[in-house]
């Protein structure tokens, strides 16, 4: 019978995910984000305008609503742009890495042996620009699932095939 050992690992010798060159989201995805963003803010703007014109008590504060609306619009646009620039991904031999976050950076490293299945999604606007989103479902539940948006459709299909191949090798 083999004797049990539990040696200390020198963490300085472990590979560093921080040194991996990550791929940013496709530049066309910023256009998709802007269009989706615009749709939401146009709907909100129409609702506020209708409220302003149909209720007399709001006519006095309409200017404040408009100023607040545009400040929120510009701030949201800035936050979305920063968030877009921070998102990046990489696929390595044994895992996938995805980085996001504005104030604090969130980096997910998911080993392929934790992947249960993979889905490819195309939204209406994304499809117009030839982009897709790869969704990776893991054994850890929904909190550890990963969505990588803004990938060219052909590349997303290749990524899905790669991951499906990795899953098949595990079975």
Summary of predicted features, one role per range:
Residues 1-113, 117-171:
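N-terminal basic, Ser/Thr-rich segments that initiate or prime the first beta/alpha elements at protein or domain
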């Amino acid at each position: 019978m083999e004797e049990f050992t539990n040696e200390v690992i020198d963490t300085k010798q472990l590979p560093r995910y921080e040194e991996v060159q990550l791929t940013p989201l496709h530049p066309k995805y910023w256009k998709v984000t802007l269009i989706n963003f615009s749709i939401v803010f146009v709907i909100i703007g129409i609702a506020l305008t209708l409220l302003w014109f149909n209720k007399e008590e709001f006519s006095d504060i309409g200017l404040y609503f408009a100023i607040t609306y545009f400040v929120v619009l510009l701030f949201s646009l800035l936050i979305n742009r920063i968030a877009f620039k921070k998102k990046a991904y990489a696929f390595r031999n044994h895992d996938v890495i995805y980085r996001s976050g504005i104030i604090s950076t969130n980096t997910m490293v998911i080993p392929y042996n934790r992947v249960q299945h993979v889905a490819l999604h195309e939204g209406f606007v994304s499809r117009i620009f030839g982009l897709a989103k790869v969704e990776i479902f893991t054994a850890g539940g929904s909190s550890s699932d990963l969505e990588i948006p803004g990938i060219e459709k052909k590349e997303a299909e290749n990524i899905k095939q790669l991951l499906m191949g990795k899953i098949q090798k595990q079975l």
